[in-house]
Amino acid sequence: MSDFEKPGWGDRDEGSLRARLRPLSLPVRKVLARLKAAYRLIGSAVPHGEARVFYGYRRVQGEKTVTIGGLVKVRALARVFPNTTHGFNVLYLVSSGLPRGAVALAQAAKRKNVRVVINQNGVAYPGWYGKKFKSLNEPMAELLRIADHVFYQSEFCRMAA
């Protein structure tokens, strides 16, 4: 079996009950994500002037918590731009650490004239995620279309995205 034929991370639970139920839960999760996004932005005026940043999570992990991947960047940024869960004017998302419902949140933010900033640091590929790599890339591609600004971590990331 070649490396390309070996199961990727996304193929490991193929055939399990969880994998079979996943398509049924997707519409429910999308509705919940939209409701959650609407709640975050309901009744809040978008402030002008100083940047008020929301990173997509209620809490940004502190210094004493083990943080991995792209969310390390968020922790560093939050020291300068504290996480603001309501009344924010910038939504900053990291592609390797997207919150659930990231696309719905970004769409709702755009409707409220909130600036959407994406830190793009890679894409899924078959060797990593198996046959399901496209399903992981779809929300990232949508976020890139929505974004007002994208920080690409490398030229390769820009080309691959």
Predicted segment positions?
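N-terminal pre-catalytic "stem/leader" segment of glycosyltransferase-like enzymes
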Residues: 2-97
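Short, solvent-exposed loop/turn segments at secondary-structure junctions
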Residues: 59-60, 96-99, 122-125, 157-158
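Active-site proximal beta-strand in glycosyltransferases
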Residues: 90-92, 106-125
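Short amphipathic alpha-helices and their capping/turn segments at secondary-structure boundaries
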Residues: 38-46, 101-112
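Membrane-proximal helix-turn-helix segments that form the acceptor-binding/catalytic region
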Residues: 133-150
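A short, active-site helix/loop in glycosyltransferases that binds the activated sugar's phosphate group
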Residues: 145-161
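Short, solvent-exposed loop/turn segments at secondary-structure boundaries
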Residues: 64-67, 129-133
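Short, surface-exposed alpha-helical segments at coil->helix boundaries
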Residues: 71-75, 137, 155
